């Protein structure tokens, strides 16, 4: 029996187009004899289900061309002729979203709340890793090797960009890696 996989991609991040490529790669390489894949596109906090044979239909995304789906108690539904109809119940969600809610624990939390197993770190690990300053602090406290780092908050950078750059040049050696 094939396991049902919700292939979740899209999102609010600037990287949502990359997630479509990720989803297409998963679809190309997944063992279709073992897994039945159902694409689920995320846009502006909403789910949309579509045809697995045409994932490219989601780029550029036009919500008026797709039916909104609702995740209720671990099952995806959509409205048909005014009635809520079950689309599918995934056994697992393959998370392909990049950045933002796809990596910061939000989507992972939605899956956990709905009792759906998923590919990814858990909620806490995802949230911690998304915050680079927090991650470095935790890793340092565990005596793990961490490159020297400094933090410039966005508000401070916007107030005095040149001053922030000069300060970083003075306290760090090149090459410098910048993580927003």
Kindly label every feature range from the protein language model.
Residues 1-119, 123-124, 128-130, 134, ...:
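ATP-binding N-terminal substructure of ATP-dependent carboxylate-amine bond-forming enzymes
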Residues 19, 146-151, 175-180:
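Glycine-rich phosphate-binding loop of ATP-grasp-fold ATP-dependent ligases
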Residues 32-34, 113, 141-144, 171-172:
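Short, well-ordered coil/turn elements that cap or connect secondary structure elements
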Residues 139-140, 168-180:
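ATP-grasp fold ATP-binding core
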């Amino acid at each position: 029996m094939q396991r049902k996989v919700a292939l979740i991609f899209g999102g609010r991040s600037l990287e949502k187009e990359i997630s479509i490529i990720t989803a297409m790669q998963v679809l190309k390489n997944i063992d279709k004899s073992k897994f039945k894949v159902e694409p689920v596109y995320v846009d502006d906090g909403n789910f949309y289900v579509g045809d697995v044979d045409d994932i490219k239909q989601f780029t550029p995304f036009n919500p008026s061309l797709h039916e909104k789906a609702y995740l209720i108690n671990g099952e995806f539904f959509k409205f048909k002729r005014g009635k809520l109809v079950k689309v599918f119940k995934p056994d697992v969600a393959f998370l392909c979203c990049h950045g933002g809610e796809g990596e910061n624990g939000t989507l992972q939390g939605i899956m956990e709340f709905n009792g759906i197993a998923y590919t990814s770190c858990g909620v806490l690990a995802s949230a911690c890793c998304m915050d680079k300053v927090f991650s470095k602090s935790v890793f340092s406290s565990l005596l793990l090797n961490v490159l020297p780092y400094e933090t410039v908050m966005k508000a401070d950078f916007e107030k005095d960009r040149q001053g922030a750059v000069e300060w970083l040049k003075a306290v760090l050696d090149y090459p410098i890696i910048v993580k927003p």
